UniProtKB/Swiss-Prot annotation:
Role this protein plays: Converts guanidinoacetate to creatine, using S-adenosylmethionine as the methyl donor. Important in nervous system development.
Record annotation: effect of changing residue 156 to D: Disrupts enzymatic activity
Name this polypeptide is given: Guanidinoacetate N-methyltransferase
The RMT2 domain, residue ranges: 13-236
Annotated organism of origin: Homo sapiens (Human)
Gene name of the encoded protein: GAMT
Length: 236
């Protein structure tokens, strides 16, 4: 029997998008794993990394946009920062219900926004956010490695205030890249991510990264590399 990591996350041509919104959000009993349509969406071992992303997105205070709620790991950390408002886009029905239950208990105002970011983001005004954290799950084999670029190019730059910060991840993609193509995570980011950030309008001198050591559990299907990279991308 093959190891869990040997099973591809997406089959050729697979597209989960039509079924994703209404698919059950399967949180395990210990609340350590979230799966949707059998996909490993989030696992609690990611917590230190999610906290680093949250710290980046909330570093300017003000109004923060989070795309993807998941297990509320990053969202709960954002709430610890001195922010004013916390806008969160989430498309899955079950995850959104968890967001609705979570929101009233938070220190800072939460604005839950239901739907795919592709539908919600175009309705948001330019220059509205001091920080953005984009961490959604790829919904098709076609967009496995590229979905974040669609958001970054079409929305992230315009939604940020001048001086605002974008951070994001695509662990499902980056885990595969670090397994199959790269041994240096900073070079991976430089070669596969920076060109899209430049195309979106960010300047090279405003693109920084921080690397942390974090060893995933052996049974994690989507990430095995013992480091994680946090982008810190400022709108000049």
């Amino acid at each position: 029997m093959s190891a869990p990591s040997a099973t591809p996350i997406f089959a050729p041509g697979e597209n989960c998008s039509p079924a994703w919104g209404a698919a059950p959000a399967a949180y395990d009993a210990a609340d350590t794993h979230l799966r949707i349509l059998g996909k490993p969406v989030m696992e609690r071992w990611e917590t230190p990394y999610m906290h680093a992303l949250a710290a980046a997105a909330s570093s300017k205070g003000g109004r923060v946009l989070e795309v993807g709620f998941g297990m509320a790991i990053a969202a709960s950390k954002v709430q610890e920062a001195p922010i004013d408002e916390h806008w969160i886009i989430e498309c899955n029905d079950g995850v959104f219900q968890r967001l609705r239950d979570w929101a009233p208990r938070q220190t800072h105002k939460v604005i839950p926004l239901k739907g795919l970011w592709e539908d919600v983001a175009p309705t948001l005004p330019d220059g509205h956010f001091d920080g953005i954290l984009y961490d959604t799950y790829p919904l098709s084999e076609e967009t496995w490695h590229t979905h974040q670029f669609n958001f970054i190019k079409n929305h992230a730059f315009r939604l940020l205030k001048p001086g605002g910060v974008l951070t994001y991840c695509n662990l499902t993609s980056w885990g595969e890249l670090m397994k199959s193509k790269y041994s240096d995570i900073t070079i991976m980011f430089e070669e596969t991510q920076v060109p899209a950030l430049l195309e979106a309008g960010f300047r090279r001198e405003n693109i920084r990264t921080e690397v942390m050591a974090l060893v995933p559990p052996a049974d994690c299907r989507y990430y095995a590399f013992p480091q994680m990279i946090t982008p810190l991308v400022t709108k000049g």
